[in-house]
Amino acid sequence: MGVDLGLNDYSVDDLAAIDFDGADYDKRPSEETVQAALQRRHDQEFSRPLPRCIVTTDTESQAFNVHVRDGKPVDQLFITFENSSVLEITEQLENWEPPRDIDGVIWGEATFQLPAGLPQGWHTITLVSDNISHSCTLVVTPTHLSTTDTYINNPVAGVMAQLYSVRSSDSWGIGDFRDIGYLGETLANNGAGDFLLINPLHAAEPFPPVEDSPYLPATRRFINPIYIRIEDIPEIELLAEDVRTEVTELARQFREHNRDNVQIERDPIYEAKLRALREIFHAGRDETREQLFRDYIHREGDGLTAFAEWCAKQEIAKLGTGNHAEDEPPVDFYMWLQWICDQQLAAAQARCTAAGMKIGIMADLAVGVHPFGADAETLANVLAPCASVGAPPDNYNQYGQDWSQPPWHPERLAEAGYKPWRDMLRTILRHAGGIRIDHVLGLFRLYWMPRNQSPQTGTYVNYDFRALVGIVALEAERAGAVVIGEDLGTFEPWMQDVLNQYGIMGTSVLWFEGSPYGGARRLEEYRKACLASVTTHDLPPTAGFLRGKHITLRNELGLLKSNLDEELNNDLNWQAEVLNRVLEQGGFAGEDFHMDNFHGRARDERGDVEVLVTAAHRFVAHTPAALTCTALVDMVGDENVQNQPGTAKEQYPNWCVPLRNAQGNIVLIDDLNEMPLFHKIAEASHRPAPGN
């Protein structure tokens, strides 16, 4: 794309026709060029023996077209299922499409129909014609994810937390896998929830400096080793005494500062952990552990190898080969890191469920990846590398957003049988009872813009949503997991209908929920198939939101286009609408609170902020939502914004803010049991018994 030419100069068909893959268009292609490209694509489709991939449900009887050389019959057409059994496809439908001459070859089209009731899974369709065999992937998904109905009938509550910010006294300056289990156990023991929603754990750069944002990873399939708890690796016992002493000293340097009221600095933490991890890796493993490691490598296949090779290549290019013994290539080290991550995440999930959590860990899936990361290179064949994903301008970010992430290329992903999408989901769901998909509307369409250009130059590009959503449902069904789609933002209502059909629950946030009859949404108007919460990680904690920090911070950073006083006044009026609804429908029950109307009240005239926060969570707990989620920052009185969209590190310390209380002091997991507010909001967040 040329510097001055935005994607909004093109239609979606134009983008498909010019195959937006990195070509440098200095000006808009002529209409003749676009039409010729479109015709070329249509010809390519008509000369394709089988579709790129077929995705259907286990209740549909789906029709599909095959193409053979004119006059040549379809000799064989059959399905090979996952279990190696075979089913011939015999039902042919009428098709009056005339043959076409494409580059001197006459092609004909025939239509066949798949039978309904096919088993769920990943299968293969094979076509044989003129002694030539062709195949494509067939994916059969559930019509509806069964776990959704389980929680609609028996609603549960959970807690959301940013793992890096939630530390214990033994942490190395950042929350880690052991802290997940510790926090989950603490929450379960206090009746605070059946799941723990945490930020994406996707891997960042293989060595410092590393990206702070968990939503801009190097890969979405593999895990960030910065979360490894060094002391929980069995092979630490094999270290020589002097090396073990060195590792202990590294840990001490960070543990002593866990209560320092400073931002989280990932680079020194990761550098120290990598030093310790290399020592443990070189200490070796016993025969049993070595076999487990090799089994893991075999199971993960080419994807793990490609990722580890990318990491090793980055290391050698920047650091040289001196970090490894000659007989221990860096590739093995990076595969080993992923194995340790996998084991420790499994232990964290086991600890959560052993404590009584029904779901346990709820993983978070970022929208995309870093443009120069592992996935951008190893999955380049299914991405559109010269595009960037973001969001158009809206009321909360009036300049729009550029997330600096290359999007899936719709057709290339289908050509790959959606296997990169499947493999990523399987890895994430292996040790999680649920998954939240950030910006789930990206499974329908994504806002593309040329890289390094303004979000105002962008346009939406559509995806095969039934394929992407159906595969989510299939992999979640196999994992026994729930799926939450973050469906906030600009969308058409039918998209929510599709998600609901597949059993993908939506997201409802108290402050964003207006009633179709005016004012704030009433309890009974909330969706059942959703995760309802008071706040999100893109808003200040509720105490800060009530004080207007979501507006004053944007004003301080130059992100507010409208008048500050007008914005604050409009926000205050809407907060009054919401709080009046909370008051009207029992949110303040049991509180020493005597106000009868929030309208006309200044922010400091509405009573104790802790009471308001507690009431908001009590209200959400009584909605019919299948899942409700309480922010850990609210349970400790924090007011600090974790992430301010549309800003860089130089403007705001996004994703580096530690957990603090209302007084601004650091809070560790060890402190939670001694905090009255933690217990108060935990109790307010309890779901009422069915029928109450």
Q: Which ranges hold each PLM region?
A:
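Residues at alpha-helix termini
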Residues: 2-4, 17, 189, 354, ...
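Structured C-terminal cap/extension of enzyme domains
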Residues: 637-691
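Short acidic/polar inter-strand loop motif in beta-rich domains
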Residues: 130-135
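Alpha-amylase-like alpha-glycosidases and glucanotransferases acting on alpha-linked glucans and related
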Residues: 84, 207-342, 368-629, 633, ...
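Acidic/aromatic-lined carbohydrate-recognition and catalytic surfaces
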Residues: 18-84, 88-91, 96-127, 140-378
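Short, solvent-exposed cationic patches
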Residues: 555-557, 563-568, 679-692
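Basic helix-extension-helix modules of the SAP/HeH family
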Residues: 1-23
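Residue-level detector of anion-binding/catalytic polar loops
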Residues: 4, 193-194, 358-360, 434, ...
